[in-house]
Design a protein with these regions (language model features):
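N-terminal cap/lid segment of alpha/beta-hydrolase-fold proteins
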Residues: 20-49
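Short beta-strand/loop motif that positions the catalytic acidic residue
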Residues: 198-200
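Short substrate-entry loop that stabilizes the transition state in hydrolases
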Residues: 48-52, 57-94, 165-166, 205-210
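Short alpha-helix in the alpha/beta-hydrolase fold that links the catalytic acid
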Residues: 208-221
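Primarily recognizes the serine-hydrolase "nucleophile elbow" in alpha/beta-hydrolase
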Residues: 66, 106-193
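Short beta-strand-to-loop junctions in surface cap/lid or active-site-entrance loops
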Residues: 39-50, 115, 184-189
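Catalytic nucleophile-loop/oxyanion-hole region of alpha/beta-hydrolase
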Residues: 87-109, 113, 118
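C-terminal catalytic histidine-bearing segment of alpha/beta-hydrolase fold enzymes
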Residues: 227-287
Length: 287
């Protein structure tokens, strides 16, 4: 019995612990502001390391809904160092847009300094609200406002962004749109030419179930190079929040097409989740 216990102890001792840790990420809303910190989950590569970092930005429901874990685990197994920001826990605690964008820059700077990560190969992906931050991270304003210096995201993947909102911003008309409150009207008028993949929900309630909404956004990008490196993949018959793990609906005030009200319907789709993972992986691995 003693030998059995000893063998079990030895076996357990060589099983690696989960390759994740809770870390603190520095951020600042501008060059004169005090440096603050937010929590994040850092995952080390479980597969062959590929020297790439991936920042994962959750949706407006908050980190507590645990949507980012599935992506952190998946991409860590593909050799990425992943960082899931805890931007806020619940929707009612959502910070202002200026702070949210500062979080994204903080994540870029954190990953770029890690040993084993090529600072030129740090990418970002986000869902819904996180997708807005991801798209905005292709703008020149983002790097100027948050002192990015020579740092740039390598690639960007936006999952089910609300594209009528992005189209308004691309036109220089973000007024009255909550995710853009406090941002200059010109914040999406100049671009960095960073490859951007948009995975659009063909039945997104926010976009009036218009499967062409994200294509329309790309057509309104006023920079030829950025438009050329922005690709849209539409998941037909798929709703906003396809990766939330449950079905639900709620009233949206002023956030639907043309600043109108609507009922957002979310239907969980494991098929779309798997398809999305593979699409983003192929995008990030492509030369």
């Amino acid at each position: 019995m003693k030998n059995l216990i000893f063998c079990c102890f030895v076996l357990l001792s060589v099983i690696p612990a989960s390759a994740q840790s809770l870390v603190k990420v520095d951020y600042s809303v501008d060059k004169c502001a005090t440096i603050k910190q937010l929590d994040a989950v850092l995952r080390s590569p479980e597969g062959e390391p590929n020297k790439q970092g991936l920042l994962i930005l959750h949706h407006g429901g908050g980190f507590s809904l645990n949507t980012t874990q599935q992506y952190g685990e998946f991409f860590a197994k593909q050799g990425f160092v992943t960082l899931e920001l805890k931007m806020f826990n619940e929707h009612k605690d959502t910070p202002d847009p200026t702070t949210l964008h500062a979080f994204a820059m903080g994540g870029l700077k954190y990953l770029s300094k890690l040993p084993g990560v090529d600072p030129k190969r740090v990418s970002a992906m986000g869902m819904s609200l996180g997708a807005f931050l991801t798209v905005d991270s292709a703008s020149t304003w983002f790097y100027d406002q948050y002192q990015g210096g020579d740092l740039r995201f390598h690639k960007l993947a936006a999952l089910y962004p609300v594209c009528w909102l992005m189209t308004e911003a691309a036109k220089g008309q973000p007024q009255g749109i909550r995710p853009f409150t406090g941002l200059p009207s010109s914040f999406l008028q100049k671009w960095e030419g960073i490859p951007l993949l948009i995975l659009a929900a063909g039945k997104d309630s926010y976009d009036s179930q218009d499967s062409t909404a994200c294509g329309n956004f790309v057509q309104n990008i006023n920079d030829t190079k950025q438009a050329q490196v922005t690709k849209v993949e539409v998941f037909e018959n798929t709703t906003h929040g396809w990766d939330h793990g449950k079905n639900y609906s709620f009233l949206v005030r002023g956030g639907c097409t043309g600043r109108t009200n609507c009922t957002n319907i979310t239907v969980y789709s494991p098929t779309a989740v798997d398809k999305g993972k593979q699409s983003v992986l192929s995008f990030l691995k492509a030369q």
